[in-house]
Amino acid sequence: MSTTIADQSPAVPSPVEAALARLPRVVDLLAARAEEHDRDATFPYQGIEAVHEAGLLTLTVDRRYGGPGGSLADTVQVLAQLGRGDASVAVVTAFTLLQHAEQARTANWPTAGYRRLLTESRRGPALVNTLYVEPGGRSGEPPSTLARWDGTGWRLTGRKTYCTGAEALAWMAVTARTDEPEPRTGTFLVRGESEGLEVDPTWDQLGLRASASHDVVLDEVRVPAELALGLNPSKGGTGKGATGSAARPGGASAAGVVPAAELARAWHDLALSAVAVGVARSAQDWLVRFLHQRTPANLTEPLGSLPRYRSALGEIEAQLIGAEELVHGLAPRVDRAEPDAVARTGPAHLLATRAAISAVQQAVSLTGNPGLSRRHPLERYLRDVLSSRVHLAPDEAVLEAAGRAALDRGARH
């Protein structure tokens, strides 16, 4: 059989494949600047620009909007690698990717508003996040932020806290309740440069210091009527935001159809898990170099030659393998909307985060003083991975939901 020239031509990579191929260079750039941004608590604009230029910031824009149509499996792969470079950049990127993925599934944004976001995304990084956490607020309560109708649009007044990427957000999806006699709760799409909007630089945390997760203060910020989404009677809080994750009910509906909110939560859980595991992998990489290079005065061989250290490193490797198998194994199943997989992402988030934290803590324990020195990145990895818990529901809530689901299954058999 003859072979034509066309048969020998290399396959043209898809937009997703092309973006993934640019990941290593981006990760190297992020790692080179991460210590500086962590030390000074400055937002990593250059790093976000690199993520954007590589096509990674819009990876989950749906094909019907002209985007790559990246899946959750693609997303966790990207975020795990970005987490190796700079956890703050990875977390900021995660929330923008989650917004585009939500639009791909639900088309909640009005067409004109989303087109505007995509136009901005072609010109440069256009970060988006949901702002729902409020000072003193409790999960399940309606938001305190008020929306007042002025005759042609809405005026928003209130304060949101822990708003990841606050100073650089192009758009903010702000949860609020109306001041009507029978209040409604919804999400209002707010431009980051809106008049009456102020970023209060309150973020001064142990880890993720470059994420600019500041407070956002809204004072009569005007929102056009068409940018108010999902206004429903106020029976409780809505949405999820930059920090925090409510426990999901124990499984999908009886008909096997996964509710949109459950899919959104599954994406959130696995995306943030991937970042934490990526940070832990960087800690392990540093530990491996340390064990190869460190030869105490009372030894003639590096620490890595000792069975004790090899065994401890093996324990770290086993934990991270387990976490990666959970995250990367569940992601394609969530892409297929398998109810059982979606229901497992809450416990998977808990287990992956625990494994990542334990792995980095063990690495610090093995290295002693050098691991806690600001001259080395290991202590930053520890602070960042500990801070990953802010994106996780309380352990008891996750485990209680998982236990309830197990009891429900038992009652059906």
Residue ranges and their predicted role:
Residues 1-14, 240-245, 413:
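Actinobacteria-biased recognition of intrinsically disordered, low-complexity terminal regions
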Residues 45-52, 59-164:
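Glycine-rich flavin
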Residues 205-319:
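Glycine-rich beta->alpha junctions and the first turn(s) of the following alpha-helix
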